[in-house]
Amino acid sequence: MLIFEHSRKNRRNYSQAPATRPAKNNIPDHLKRKSTPLLPEVSEMDTVRHYTRLSQKNFSIDTEFYPLGSCTMKYNPRACNSLAMLPQFLSRHPLAPEDTGQGFLACMYELQEILKDITGMAAVSLTSMAGAQGELIGITMIRAYHEAHGDTGRTEIIIPDAAHGTNPATAVMCGYKVIEIPTNRDGDVDMDALKAAVGPKTAGLMLTNPSTLGVFEKKVAEMSRIVHAAGGLLYYDGANLNAVLGKVKPGDMGFDVIHMNLHKTFSTPHGGGGPGAAPVGVAERLLPYLPVPIVAHEQGVYRWLTEEDRPQTIGRLSAHMGNAGVLLRAYIYVRLLGAEGMHRISEYATLNANYLMAELRKLGFEIAYPNRRASHEFIVTMKEIKDRTGVTAMNLAKRLLDKGFHAPTTYFPLLVPECLLIEPAETESKETLDRFVAAMKEILDEIATQPDMVKAAPHDMPLRKIDDVKAARELDLVWDPAG
């Protein structure tokens, strides 16, 4: 039921604006709307009940463990939200003169510098508003680099078969042909295939490290040498940066460009369709092409660098400089944790993943890459269980909902049949992981004794069986008062 369906004519609710200061309305009369906005007329009690019921129908990191692989569903500290919503930040207009926003510009400059240090890059731009847009920026800069050097014959981007789907989509959007290379049985990129794929047409290699298989590419330095020797550049998909914070820098691995998902590694809110942010870092060779604006600090004053300062820039990717509120939350997060805290993130994320992997292995679950240490996530394959009982990975995932846990990522990466990609972020306690293990044991016992019951799951959700295809293909997000 939508909030609009609770609406009744002339039903009222009190405005709950802050009472600490008088309300200001500086909107000129000629810009004020003349008609009444189409808003629901609902009492305070009905409003509270409506949104409380909705929250009870959804899983969230605020209520339970959320081991969604390759998504890093860590807790978002409330302090980050509170500080980012200070009136001084919220009332700042992006077109205000630079001298009136020195505090905000200082925060953005420091965030750029912190991300440079974390990644080992020469410079960072904060303008990108999503991970996929960060990829687009990175590959566009690689293209600009080759074109600036007259190397227009480079028409191919090499991508491992374990990559996120956005990688090949980005390469195609930038006009490149995708060359897919296989993964070997240990989970690493097949080096012979890489050597065979590189050549005068190679524009670059897109790589996630650790990969979506949950393992660190052991020969990443050699891969860098091979691609660079062929004249190509290396793109780092920062989806799994959480696993290596403070331990190794993408710049030290030889990468030329990186995007960082702030909603993963730097604890900004997930979901809801945004707002998002994915800062992009570059090595020296790509520095001229960074998108603008970028914050500079010169003679004690912060200012925007624009196209006039960076004539070779690929341009602007957002109306101003990205999603300011999200960037502020990330800045506050890294300042709260400090350097030591950033080191501990990767340590605890890796510890949690390996502990959970070991406990599930003891129960009899098959680990996809049993000879490798989990970097921050790992894969359980249920192929043998499905062949023996007919119970699929999706069945188990839906049964986990009945146990009070969000399901892991299912059927990704595509290389592993009947897979569950499980990522316990660093913020989860051992007690939480043990409860999850106990739930997995219960389901394993149910598969042995009541497989049909598991196949029919979930049983206790407000909505049980959803048409996944229709939900994805036929979105209906606009309320129509006429029905």
UniProtKB/Swiss-Prot annotation:
The gene is gcvPB. It is an enzyme of class 1 (oxidoreductase). It holds the Pfam family GcvP2_C. PANTHER family: GLYCINE DEHYDROGENASE (DECARBOXYLATING), MITOCHONDRIAL, GLYCINE DEHYDROGENASE, DECARBOXYLATING. Residues 1-33 are annotated as: Disordered. GO terms for biological process: glycine decarboxylation via glycine cleavage system. Keywords: Oxidoreductase, Pyridoxal phosphate. The glycine cleavage system is composed of four proteins: P, T, L and H. In this organism, the P 'protein' is a heterodimer of two subunits. The modification N6-(pyridoxal phosphate)lysine is found at K264. Transmembrane segments: none annotated. This is Probable glycine dehydrogenase (decarboxylating) subunit 2. Belongs to the GcvP family. C-terminal subunit subfamily. The keyword Oxidoreductase applies.
